[in-house]
Each structure stands twice: as structure tokens, then as C-alpha cells.
Amino acid sequence: MLLEFAIGDAYGRTFEFASKEFIKEHNDIKGYKHREGEIMDGIGIYTDDTQMSLGVAELLLSGAPTTQIRYAHHFLDAYKRDPRGGYSRRIRAALEDSNPRFPFEFLLKTKPAGFKSNGSVMRTMAIGLIPNTDEIIHN
């Protein structure tokens, strides 16, 4: 499941924020395309959504209780071992400036800023790894 998500994420990143014309012309599933204006980098590279999903999955598979601090620790670990783009400036700065040994720093730097996005929803697919509903609700 995680592999398929990462492949779809890497394929789809080309079309995020792209013009309708670009999407119509290039979304043919024949291979990865460059983003509009992109020269060579970025083909086949997954985004922040996959990276944070890996952090969620690693926490859930560890068997440790799920807390904000533990999520922050796993998000930081995932980012620090393989930094990549896709994050908002504010979140990327918090990831760069925070130490995984002190995840509370990351939580303090990422308090909600009054805007909504679909980022958190994109990162919840790893919850599908939990086999029973009661455990999902508990976590």
C-alpha cells in the first residue's frame, strides 16, 4: 500500500498546480513528465505527503502509543533522513530547525496558522495498516 501511494504521489506531483492544458497534454500514464517550467530534477520523486505518511506508518508499526510528541518525532526523523520539497515555507523551516530528539520544538513551531489544507488528510492513509476499527479510533 505504501509503495503504491508513493508511486501515485510521484506521478501526480507533476500535475499539482499545473494548467488544465498541461494536464490534458501530458497526463497519459506513459511515464513521468517534467513539471511546467522544471528542467531535469523531480521526475519520479515522491513528495512531502508520502514522506509524512512514512512517519505515520513507522509510528503505528512501532507499537508505541500515539501522541503528538511521537508523531512529531517520526515526522522529523522521516524528513531528516531524506529532506525534500513540497512543504510550505513555514513547515519546511520548522522541519529544518528542529531536532528529532526534541520534537516539542517542532510542535511549538507548527501551531495552526489559521489556514486549512488537505495535507493532513493526504498523510492519513497509513492508518489503513491498522486492522481493526476500535484500534483506529483509539489511535
Where are the language model's segments positioned?
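Structured, active/binding-site neighborhoods that engage oxygen-rich ligands
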Residues: M1-N139
